[in-house]
Amino acid sequence: MKNYRTESDSFGEIQIEEKFYWGAQTQRSLENFKIGKQKMPEILIRALAILKKCAAQVNHEFGDLEAKIAISIDKATDRILEGEFEDNFPLVVWQTGSGTQTNMNMNEVIASIANEELTGKKGGKSPVHPNDHVNKGQSSNDSFPTAMHIATVLATKQQLIPALNNILTSLQDKSKDWDKIIKIGRTHLQDATPLTLKQEFSGYITQIEYALERIENALQKVYLLAQGGTAVGTGINSKIGFDIKFAEKVAEFTKQPFKTAPNKFESLAAHDALVEFSGTLNTIAVSLMKIANDIRLLGSGPRCGLGELHLPENEPGSSIMPGKVNPTQVEALTMVCSQVMGNHVTVTIAGSNGHLELNVFKPVIIYNILQSIELLSDSVNSFVTHCVKGLEPNIARINDLRDKSLMLVTALNPHIGYDNAAKIAKEAHKHGITLKEAAKKLNLLSEAKFDKIVVPEKMVSQS
């Protein structure tokens, strides 16, 4: 049999199962928003706990929160950050667009934990009040966007940047000895002039290097925190200097360069910084989609495709075709990239709906950004472990395709002109003969002269 306790808010009393620490506003949200199963991300909950910890410390230093209350709030946030109360944050993303219910969920749980420590009884509003003490000098309108920024930075630094460094290092290590492997290039999916396999992979490496640079650039505005703007950006009920001191506390605790936002009206009414950051995630997805698809194409086969790369064989690929093995890691990564691109569309629409003094699409913005970070990080690490590290060049196939290519004729352009070189290529293709045979047949070039000019090793750099 379940035990219940009575909590209350401005709408009256409500029953809450005794084992949970939340209060009336959280319970009402649970009952009013039975929509989907997409709960607020765990890292956002952690960001809110960090926020409440730092706010309590500043309020105490400013003389607005007595030591006993401040210490109890500080201890409660520590326990939350240690993962002790994970089942006490049950609210879904689909709630008020300001994130008020989740902000109050945190306020109520912290107050309840603190009250239990001080009185032996969870819940209630005394001696620690969820609004008057835990939420002191704050509004959901500045607290939730602050938590959004903290969560984005932490997720990026803890998950995404390490994952991108992982694939960067793996691509560098894998391709470092491929500078002597000369293969045929392809443009428009048609044969082109040669390059080395290392040169081809250097393009992918640079894309990842640029991705890391883009992240650092986009994070600069995400480091700016809205806290101190309170309801509409004026800072009502927040003391002068609270915003600066708060940002310093968060920076110290997280070891990240957070600062107070110079204009709180912008920080509450718009989320351009997060839209920009989502755009960076979208660009990373574009880069990864290109890299993964190239590896998919280069590994196509095993007998009837390009077959220039051997991809690791991790599991059976077909329920009907015996022996078939598919590029499953590529498929997983490219599906993630598709999801991230879709997430950015959602963030773009949500970011554009900042009406007057407050954007009220905050939960869906942060949900999609954090999902994109998590999916990109996990899929990249999986791709590295189960695909990139096991890539091997198929030297025989690479050499065969290169030597058959008609585009080696490009080396003849400076010597016999574009039109004559084109005649050789067309003649070779039409009659199924080699370029050398076609050149001799058309009396355009001797075999000796051809062999001196058409050297793939000399075609992979400027003359």
Swiss-Prot record:
Catalytic activity: (S)-malate = fumarate + H2O
Localisation: Cytoplasm
Domain of life: Bacteria
Predominant cellular place of this UniProt entry's protein: cytoplasm
Pathway: Carbohydrate metabolism; tricarboxylic acid cycle; (S)-malate from fumarate: step 1/1
Pfam family, one: Lyase_1
Binding site for substrate: 98-100, 129-132, 139-141, 187, 319, 324-326
Record's protein name: Fumarate hydratase class II
Organism of origin: Rickettsia conorii (strain ATCC VR-613 / Malish 7)
